[in-house]
């Protein structure tokens, strides 16, 4: 093998390794059996959510994962493999892939990485049930507002009760 080919492969592995480093989550799937239309629809939905899906050689994936300390993923890099990387929303790849896996039996989630930790299939499926970032932020805002809202209602009720009392 020529030095040029080896250098090119090393550059590909380095690029994948950088994607693993910068990703908040990555989901590894087996896509064998999906039609072109299904893969196109999946890629479109992932892209709209800010997720990048790539079909990569298992050897490159294994080397890049090992370089980042994700040796536990070596077993999932077998057969046709695609990886969905997200740099922003750690839930998006899991949620979208789980949705498509439910719709199409051909798509199988193998494993992944969440917040720089290797995640099992069960963990990814649990993550897929969580709301997206905006949903989580709105839930947090609601929880933070509840005590203030309740206090305001109590103050209003006390004020109304004082207004209704006859003057003595």
From Swiss-Prot:
Q: Which GO terms describe its biological process?
A: translation
Family matches, as Gene3D superfamilies: 3.30.70.1730
Q: Which InterPro entries match?
A: Ribosomal_uL10 (IPR001790), Ribosomal_uL10-like_sf (IPR043141), Ribosomal_uL10_bac (IPR022973), Ribosomal_uL10_bac_type (IPR047865), Ribosomal_uL10_CS_bac (IPR002363)
In terms of PROSITE patterns, this protein maps to: RIBOSOMAL_L10
Q: Does the keyword Ribonucleoprotein apply?
A: yes
Assembly and binders: Part of the ribosomal stalk of the 50S ribosomal subunit. The N-terminus interacts with L11 and the large rRNA to form the base of the stalk. The C-terminus forms an elongated spine to which L12 dimers bind in a sequential fashion forming a multimeric L10(L12)X complex.
Listed name of the protein: Large ribosomal subunit protein uL10
The family annotation for this protein states: Belongs to the universal ribosomal protein uL10 family.
**Molecular function, one GO term:** structural constituent of ribosome
The answer, when asked if Ribosomal protein is one of the entry's keywords, is: yes
Cite the CDD domains for this sequence.
Answer: Ribosomal_L10
Entry's Gene Ontology cellular component terms? large ribosomal subunit
Per UniProt, which keywords does this protein have?
Answer: Ribonucleoprotein, Ribosomal protein, RNA-binding, rRNA-binding
Function, as annotated, reads: Forms part of the ribosomal stalk, playing a central role in the interaction of the ribosome with GTP-bound translation factors.
């Amino acid at each position: 093998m020529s030095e040029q080919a080896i250098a090119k492969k090393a550059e590909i592995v380095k690029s994948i390794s950088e994607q693993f480093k910068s990703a908040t989550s990555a989901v590894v799937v087996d896509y064998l059996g999906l039609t072109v239309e299904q893969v196109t629809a999946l890629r479109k939905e992932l892209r709209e959510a800010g997720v990048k899906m790539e079909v990569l050689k298992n050897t490159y994936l294994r080397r890049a994962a090992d370089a980042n300390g994700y040796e536990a993923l070596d077993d999932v890099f077998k057969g046709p493999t695609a990886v969905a990387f997200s740099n922003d929303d750690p839930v998006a790849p899991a949620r979208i892939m789980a949705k498509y896996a439910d719709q199409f039996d051909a798509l199988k989630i193998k494993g992944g990485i969440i917040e720089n930790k290797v995640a099992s299939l069960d963990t990814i499926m649990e993550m897929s049930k969580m709301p997206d970032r905006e949903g989580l932020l709105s839930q947090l805002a609601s929880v933070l507002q509840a005590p203030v809202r309740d206090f305001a209602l109590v103050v209003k009720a006390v004020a109304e009760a004082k207004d209704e009392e006859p003057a003595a």
